């Protein structure tokens, strides 16, 4: 048994001295005698001293306490025993529902699947949200990012996606709450409970009030649980299709920045850690699909000061298959979900994957919206009357498209009082195709606001004229 003693404590950073011939490896977990605190080795400083990060509060720690090397990285329980439970970064239950039953424990630091084991798919994942299904469709087994500044609706959009996909998708889900509000974690738990899908969801939380070590590692804990479901073969010899929700990936980066500063590394651009790209890559490369099973990942990405060129969101962009960008200017118009249809993109946007009709409709919608965007300056200076008849028609259609992108959400029913709407992809394509074809030029634009499919628009317009 390899034991050392604490020699220095600076906030969440603890230095431990071991015999020089028996220094623990980087990422090994150390247990401190008489406490529940786990330390993770981050650096070997020489002379037998290792610098570690504490996964938990260091209150009450003092010099010369004995730390024991476990000989392996942090391990967490995996398997069906985690479903329906809320756990912390170490896999301990925090929902007061008794101990977790498990048959296996996995280390949270793992290698990504090898190149030949990976598999890609072109199968689409229908979300029931019009603007997403039309403009930036999701792939099954793909990676999706929800980008947005503070208060534009990332978490509400994620909750709606969970509501629409996790309920329709019979597989398993893992939710990792990384550095977010505890209230949101609580809301999510009750939302899942009320909709009877709690027994298919494992929840791992490392919230805002926790030390940086917890927030940095909790995403890996959630990912490890998802990997187990993907890789563990059932009686048919296949793994499972898993949904992995991470809210919020920016807090993962931020925790890394805090840890990096505490470890004494020289900061890089905007104060981020110099290892930002590597840390992001280590996490993202593991979120992938294999021939055995798939992980479909939906990640919320906070955009500091609405600046998409900030190193953190910019580093995340390269790893994603679909990006859903939420815009403050669209939220200011009262259009929710506040997705920017011109700034959101998807690798699935190919006629061979989504079909000619969907592709052509999306292109025409984008052209109409882009034309309106280009004309906005002229309208602001000269007014609508100075536009040509063709331009007036384009503006009218674009405003209808903008409003038709809005949609009442199931998870927002309690706030808005309007019942949520799920719109199948075929209905979405049919509706937008009809608008750009000019079939509804005679209807008022207010009729397109906060409805489901195009039939509801006609119904609303008839009520308005009645």
Swiss-Prot record:
Belongs to the ATPase alpha/beta chains family. It is found in: Cell inner membrane. ATP binds at residues 148-155. Its EC number is 7.1.2.2. This is ATP synthase subunit beta. It is a peripheral membrane protein. It is an enzyme of class 7 (translocase). GO terms for molecular function: ATP binding; ATP hydrolysis activity; proton-transporting ATP synthase activity, rotational mechanism. F-type ATPases have 2 components, CF(1) - the catalytic core - and CF(0) - the membrane proton channel. CF(1) has five subunits: alpha(3), beta(3), gamma(1), delta(1), epsilon(1). CF(0) has three main subunits: a(1), b(2) and c(9-12). The alpha and beta chains form an alternating ring which encloses part of the gamma chain. CF(1) is attached to CF(0) by a central stalk formed by the gamma and epsilon chains, while a peripheral stalk is formed by the delta and b chains. Produces ATP from ADP in the presence of a proton gradient across the membrane. The catalytic sites are hosted primarily by the beta subunits. The keyword Protein transport does not apply. PROSITE patterns: ATPASE_ALPHA_BETA. InterPro entries: AAA+_ATPase, ATP-synt_VA_C, ATP_synth_F1_bsu, ATPase_a/bsu_AS, ATPase_alpha/beta_chains, ATPase_F1/V1/A1_a/bsu_N, ATPase_F1/V1/A1_a/bsu_N_sf, ATPase_F1/V1/A1_a/bsu_nucl-bd. Keywords: ATP synthesis, ATP-binding, Cell inner membrane, Cell membrane, CF(1), Hydrogen ion transport, Ion transport, Membrane, Nucleotide-binding, Translocase, Transport. GO terms for cellular component: plasma membrane; proton-transporting ATP synthase complex. Its main location: membrane. It catalyses: ATP + H2O + 4 H(+)(in) = ADP + phosphate + 5 H(+)(out).
